[in-house]
Amino acid sequence: MSKIQHVTAQRFALPLKEVLSDAMHGDHTHFELICATITLENGLSGSGYSYTGGKGGHAIVAMIEHDLAPYLTGRDSVDVEALYEGMNFHIHYVGRGGIAAFAISALDIALWDLRCKAADKPLYEMLGGASDRCKAYRGGIDLNYPLPKLLASIEGYLDEGFDAVKIKVGKAELAEDVKRVRAVRQLIGDDIDFMVDANYALDYAR
């Protein structure tokens, strides 16, 4: 009854309200959401997703439909860890990162959704967690934000109750990054955790 009957995948293009930029990938005008659903012979279904910054979604769906769905169909959904390893090995010849990782991630989440539904337990309990709380931070794709808008967004994060924030860095001039980092630190004070993310765009010297 816990055997997988069929697997489906869909791609959704989600337009953004404004252009978002980072130092490595440039401007984002939309995100792609790849949703996967795994249905068992007993009718129970689980859903998972992965997302992109606007490129590669069609390829991810194709890998699910043509390679991973046939692999999963007919297999027992109970041993999620074994299925995860099996999916990786099934497509290892064409890579364990990139498109393959996005496709497997969506299906792995769907399998965990099934496991939780079957046990009628939340995910944190199924993972052995002793708490239903975790440390969280708030950040955005904000490299193109003028400084006043950046600071306003940080104030919004603090108003939401976050005690850790992150901004993008990687401006053409290092001095501009330093200016933005200094302004954010002055705004949030010393008690808020502060992170920066250059998306691999900075060399060692910078």
Explain the meaning of each model-derived region.
Residues 1-195, 199-205:
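N-terminal capping/lid subdomain adjacent to the active-site entrance of alpha/beta enzymes
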